[in-house]
Amino acid sequence: MVIIWWFWSLLAICASDSFRDQAVAIMRTTPVIDGHNDLPWQLLNLFNNQLLRPDADLNKLAQTHTNIPKLKAGFVGGQFWSAYMPCDTQNKDAVKRILEQMDVIHRMCQLYPETFMCVTNSSDILQAFRRGKVASLIGVEGGHLIDSSLGVLRTLYHLGMRYLTLTHNCNTPWADNWLVDRGDDEAESHGLSPFGKRLLNEMNRLGVMIDLSHVSVATMKDALQISRAPVIFSHSSAYSLCPHRRNVPDDVLQLVKNTSSLVMVNFFSNFVSCSDSATLPQVADHLDHIKKVAGAGAVGLGGDYDGVTMLPVGLEDVSKYPDLIAELLRRNWTETEVRGLLADNLIRVFSEVELVSNNMQSPEEVPITLKELDGSCRTYYGYSQAHSIHLQTGALVASLASLLFRLHLL
């Protein structure tokens, strides 16, 4: 009896190794493109973006989910690095701070040219693959970071931004965030405001992917209806398996299918199992569910490494992707489906976004209205209403001064 148990255990181990070997073989030619990694945020918190410090060496950095050896072990060939600053920068120094975070991503590429290749288009991702480098792209996480400015949007595009997450954990003057659905924030735009819709049109024209992670369901539906190009969820999971408001409900997944869009599954335990603990097979369940509802072309990976504190057992850092792929092969995912998940689906969406951009010419020029803006530190140059108010206030002050002068003479 013991011999039989040993024999079957040995067969199981061999089968497991076989699936992992198959995963590695696939990933050697189609490496992972992950949709969301917060290493730049960790570089700010740990080193104040001083990359030349000896303890900031990405070949040796031990306290993060991400470093160069782990990326190589995980067969990561493309990464959207998150340029992120929290919502408390809104109406303050958001634009300055996001420029600094984009700068640190560019400096990563300059400091480690043998590992990272900063790219800005879909064809260059494939070129980076061929050179054995990590194609490094910039995703700006939070619409508050453009300060409701079409000009800032365009400038960040020219500096390398290739997706914009419309909100983080706060509303912008033009889009509602996911906390509205939980009842923690009030709906202000009830999805997208008229300016928000114009801003999405400008994103389409530029070739900036629209990222709907962190937004309210109403914002999701507005964007999926309005966008001329497919959209992405850079780091979200399936609401049906874990009813957290950061996840994507099935009716939205159907819209994702109808628009050839993409959901890149988040590994944060609270979004996977709705608890502090989760497992690798539970992440595979989310991938299975999205594939079932939206199709194999609609699923990708957006682990949220270095942006979360709790990760599933078996997916503790970026080196673990082959184990997840082995689990999917064990579940009878085809090689074509696996390659789609790893990279091909994202490259398709990115290419379609670029194609839409090539067919759009005229930029959006009408700015957000003055009454939609907030913040006591603002100036209002260019707004005729503000100019009118300024003239009226100036005339009132002059009249009062004249009256006081006459009273003084009396």
Swiss-Prot record:
<dbReference type="GO" id="GO:0070573">
    <property type="term" value="F:metallodipeptidase activity"/>
</dbReference>
<keyword id="KW-0862">Zinc</keyword>
<feature type="disulfide bond">
    <location>
        <begin position="242"/>
        <end position="274"/>
    </location>
</feature>
<feature type="signal peptide">
    <location>
        <begin position="1"/>
        <end position="16"/>
    </location>
</feature>
<feature type="disulfide bond">
    <location>
        <begin position="87"/>
        <end position="170"/>
    </location>
</feature>
<keyword id="KW-0224">Dipeptidase</keyword>
<dbReference type="GO" id="GO:0030336">
    <property type="term" value="P:negative regulation of cell migration"/>
</dbReference>
<comment type="function">
    <text>Independently of its dipeptidase activity, acts as an adhesion receptor for neutrophil recruitment from bloodstream into inflamed lungs and liver.</text>
</comment>
<dbReference type="GO" id="GO:0006954">
    <property type="term" value="P:inflammatory response"/>
</dbReference>
<dbReference type="GO" id="GO:0006691">
    <property type="term" value="P:leukotriene metabolic process"/>
</dbReference>
<feature type="binding site">
    <location>
        <position position="168"/>
    </location>
    <ligand>
        <name>substrate</name>
    </ligand>
</feature>
<keyword id="KW-0449">Lipoprotein</keyword>
<dbReference type="GO" id="GO:0006508">
    <property type="term" value="P:proteolysis"/>
</dbReference>
<dbReference type="GO" id="GO:0030054">
    <property type="term" value="C:cell junction"/>
</dbReference>
<dbReference type="GO" id="GO:0005886">
    <property type="term" value="C:plasma membrane"/>
</dbReference>
<comment type="subunit">
    <text>Homodimer; disulfide-linked.</text>
</comment>
<dbReference type="GO" id="GO:0071277">
    <property type="term" value="P:cellular response to calcium ion"/>
</dbReference>
<feature type="glycosylation site" description="N-linked (GlcNAc...) asparagine">
    <location>
        <position position="332"/>
    </location>
</feature>
<dbReference type="GO" id="GO:0006751">
    <property type="term" value="P:glutathione catabolic process"/>
</dbReference>
<comment type="similarity">
    <text>Belongs to the metallo-dependent hydrolases superfamily. Peptidase M19 family.</text>
</comment>
<dbReference type="Pfam" id="PF01244">
    <property type="entry name" value="Peptidase_M19"/>
</dbReference>
<dbReference type="GO" id="GO:0071732">
    <property type="term" value="P:cellular response to nitric oxide"/>
</dbReference>
<keyword id="KW-0336">GPI-anchor</keyword>
<feature type="binding site">
    <location>
        <position position="304"/>
    </location>
    <ligand>
        <name>substrate</name>
    </ligand>
</feature>
<feature type="binding site">
    <location>
        <position position="214"/>
    </location>
    <ligand>
        <name>Zn(2+) 2</name>
    </ligand>
</feature>
<keyword id="KW-0325">Glycoprotein</keyword>
<feature type="binding site">
    <location>
        <position position="36"/>
    </location>
    <ligand>
        <name>Zn(2+) 1</name>
    </ligand>
</feature>
<feature type="glycosylation site" description="N-linked (GlcNAc...) asparagine">
    <location>
        <position position="258"/>
    </location>
</feature>
<dbReference type="GO" id="GO:0072341">
    <property type="term" value="F:modified amino acid binding"/>
</dbReference>
<dbReference type="GO" id="GO:0016324">
    <property type="term" value="C:apical plasma membrane"/>
</dbReference>
<feature type="glycosylation site" description="N-linked (GlcNAc...) asparagine">
    <location>
        <position position="121"/>
    </location>
</feature>
<feature type="binding site">
    <location>
        <position position="246"/>
    </location>
    <ligand>
        <name>substrate</name>
    </ligand>
</feature>
<dbReference type="GO" id="GO:0016999">
    <property type="term" value="P:antibiotic metabolic process"/>
</dbReference>
<feature type="binding site">
    <location>
        <position position="141"/>
    </location>
    <ligand>
        <name>Zn(2+) 2</name>
    </ligand>
</feature>
<feature type="propeptide" description="Removed in mature form">
    <location>
        <begin position="385"/>
        <end position="410"/>
    </location>
</feature>
<keyword id="KW-0732">Signal</keyword>
<dbReference type="GO" id="GO:0005654">
    <property type="term" value="C:nucleoplasm"/>
</dbReference>
<dbReference type="GO" id="GO:0098552">
    <property type="term" value="C:side of membrane"/>
</dbReference>
<dbReference type="GO" id="GO:1901749">
    <property type="term" value="P:leukotriene D4 catabolic process"/>
</dbReference>
<dbReference type="GO" id="GO:0008800">
    <property type="term" value="F:beta-lactamase activity"/>
</dbReference>
<feature type="lipid moiety-binding region" description="GPI-anchor amidated serine">
    <location>
        <position position="384"/>
    </location>
</feature>
<dbReference type="GO" id="GO:0050667">
    <property type="term" value="P:homocysteine metabolic process"/>
</dbReference>
